Design a protein with these regions (language model features):
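Peripheral, non-catalytic segments of secretory and membrane proteins
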Residues: 1-278
Length: 278
């Protein structure tokens, strides 16, 4: 016999959801600002801005948001540990799919086909990152997912990613970027908590002899493998948060999209004049 367990996603009250949303918002601001500069840049400069946008959206807005939210996830009586390989793999997936989506829409001038394809790839990848991150959780209770809620979370991820890429190609100016980032932050965190609603945990009842009693570890329980949140997540989250601060400073001090376009036009004009001279 197995019994469903109570899952607490808000162990620290509103603290972890608010911090998670803040990181989703900040990552979105940096990502949108980077995308606007990538639109105006060319060559190596465009690659650098696309890279920073991918790191900000995939690394900060999506991955850090997810694992800050997971710091508030507990199951009474169960020890939770994390697989370091799967956890880091989920970070790589988040950054990679964001890079694909941004590159598609920026290099193809935001065409409808590129937007839809990029949104599908990025959204599917973001949902995959979420469930890969959940697979990284090691605990004695058995994980099960409600397929209807999983599907809903994937739809939210694809729609949110498509909207994010649309914003990346359309918004100009800080007020518009902030407004778009508020919406994107809500979509990203909404997808996470919808995905968490799909999770159900079950454990052996007191009459079972499998070594784990619901809500109460027994002497026979095997400790799950992996690293604790303080050992793995905290250093990663802090490190990426510091990198986010650096990226925010870079964006604040960098030329605006308009200035980059004017600089590009000046270079093209100077090149044309030299060609005429010779």
């Amino acid at each position: 016999m197995r019994a469903l367990l109570h899952v607490n996603g808000f162990t620290y009250g509103p603290l972890t959801p608010l911090l998670a949303y803040l990181m989703a918002f900040l990552g979105s601001v940096i990502g949108l600002q980077s995308a606007s500069r990538a639109r105006a840049a060319a060559g190596a400069s465009r690659v650098r801005w696309l890279t920073m946008g991918s790191l900000a959206l995939g690394g900060t807005a999506i991955w850090v948001m997810h694992f800050i939210a997971m710091l508030g996830f507990t199951v009474p009586g169960a020890e939770i540990r994390y697989d370091p390989v799967l956890t880091i793999a989920s970070l790589v997936v988040a950054i990679a799919v964001t890079a694909v989506g941004l590159t598609l829409v920026v290099t193809r001038d935001g065409s409808t086909q590129a937007l839809l394809l990029g949104g599908f790839i990025t959204g599917t990848g973001v949902a995959g990152m979420h469930y890969l991150g959940m697979a990284a959780l090691h605990m004695e209770p058995q994980k099960q997912y409600d397929l209807g809620t999983v599907a809903a979370s994937e739809v939210i991820a694809v729609v949110g990613a498509t909207a994010a890429l649309w914003f990346a190609m359309r918004v100009r100016g800080l007020p518009a970027v902030i407004g778009a980032a508020i919406i994107m932050g809500a979509a990203i965190t909404g997808m996470h908590y919808t995905g968490m609603e799909a999770l159900h945990l079950s454990a052996a009842t007191a009459t079972d002899t499998t070594g784990w009693v619901a809500g109460m570890p027994t002497a026979a329980q095997n400790a799950p493998s992996g690293m604790s949140a303080s050992e793995l997540l905290t250093p990663l989250v802090v490190g990426i948060s510091i990198a986010t601060t650096v990226m925010l400073l870079i964006v604040a001090m960098a030329p605006t999209e308009r200035e980059l376009r004017e600089e590009q036009r000046a270079i093209e004009l100077a090149t044309a004049l030299r060609e005429r001279t010779y």
